């Protein structure tokens, strides 16, 4: 019997690794990305490349403009993307309810295609301030998924997977390399240019660069100032 999984795919390092993990577990993968009003589209271009390279059966990009709401440095140009390293509290790069919105889209698609597994790249190590990247959030969403769907109510349970939630960036990179992920395709930068070149100074770039250093792996990221 074919096992189908919906994998949230941003085009970044973490979600690319999770897509490879789902495939390695024998799932037929369906990749889901969202054009939510983020500062650049190069991560979605990266998502297309990654989905193709890692053999996703289908890749969908859903349009849902969260810029209408704002509330995040990633969707509101009036807010600056931080470059000074991690701070206490919830980072301003948190997009209100983004993971919940995307998981709900994934849940609907999964039920439609007969999939019962959702994968996403939540990580509590690098971004412990994000409320929707905690283990208790993952467990709570799985409970919701099984209360809110026909399949769940009838006992055909959904499972929500966050396989990198307790991994360091170096561990994620090493795992991805073992699975054949080409990280040169991925875009993690909050301020990447139209060609996908990273700024090198935002917090996401800093964490990514440090991860490659800690993993002892050459950094394939293309930087704007290189």
UniProtKB/Swiss-Prot annotation:
A Pfam family this chain is assigned to: QueC
UniProt record, GO biological process: queuosine biosynthetic process
InterPro entries per UniProt: QueC, Rossmann-like_a/b/a_fold
UniProt GO molecular function: ATP binding; ligase activity, forming carbon-nitrogen bonds; zinc ion binding
Annotated catalysed reactions: 7-carboxy-7-deazaguanine + NH4(+) + ATP = 7-cyano-7-deazaguanine + ADP + phosphate + H2O + H(+)
Residues where Zn(2+) binds: 189, 199, 202, 205
Keyword presence, Transferase: no
Cofactor note as given: Binds 1 zinc ion per subunit.
Pathway in which the depicted protein is active: Purine metabolism; 7-cyano-7-deazaguanine biosynthesis
Enzyme nomenclature, EC number: 6.3.4.20
NCBIfam families for the chain: 7-cyano-7-deazaguanine synthase QueC
Protein name in the entry: 7-cyano-7-deazaguanine synthase
UniProt source species: Cupriavidus pinatubonensis (strain JMP 134 / LMG 1197)
């Amino acid at each position: 019997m074919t096992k189908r999984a919906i994998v949230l795919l941003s085009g970044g390092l973490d979600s690319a690794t999770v897509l490879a993990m789902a495939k390695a577990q024998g799932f037929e993968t369906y990749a889901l990305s969202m054009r939510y009003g983020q500062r650049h589209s190069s991560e979605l271009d990266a998502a297309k490349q990654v989905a193709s390279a890692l053999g996703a059966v289908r890749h969908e990009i859903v349009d849902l403009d969260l810029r209408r709401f704002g509330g995040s440095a990633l969707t509101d140009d009036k807010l600056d993307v931080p470059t000074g390293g991690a701070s206490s509290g919830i980072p301003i790069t948190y997009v209100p309810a983004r993971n919940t919105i995307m998981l709900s889209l994934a849940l609907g698609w999964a039920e439609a295609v007969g999939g019962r597994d959702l994968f996403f790249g939540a990580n509590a190590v690098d971004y412990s301030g994000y409320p929707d990247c905690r283990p208790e959030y993952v467990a709570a969403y799985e409970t919701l998924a099984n209360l809110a769907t026909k399949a769940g109510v009838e006992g055909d349970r959904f499972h929500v997977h966050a396989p990198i939630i307790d991994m360091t960036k170096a561990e994620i990179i090493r795992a991805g390399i073992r699975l054949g992920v080409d990280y040169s395709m991925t875009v993690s930068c909050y301020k990447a240019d139209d060609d996908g070149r990273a700024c090198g100074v935002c917090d996401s770039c800093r964490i990514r660069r440090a991860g490659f250093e800690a993993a002892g792996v050459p950094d394939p990221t293309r930087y704007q100032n290189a």
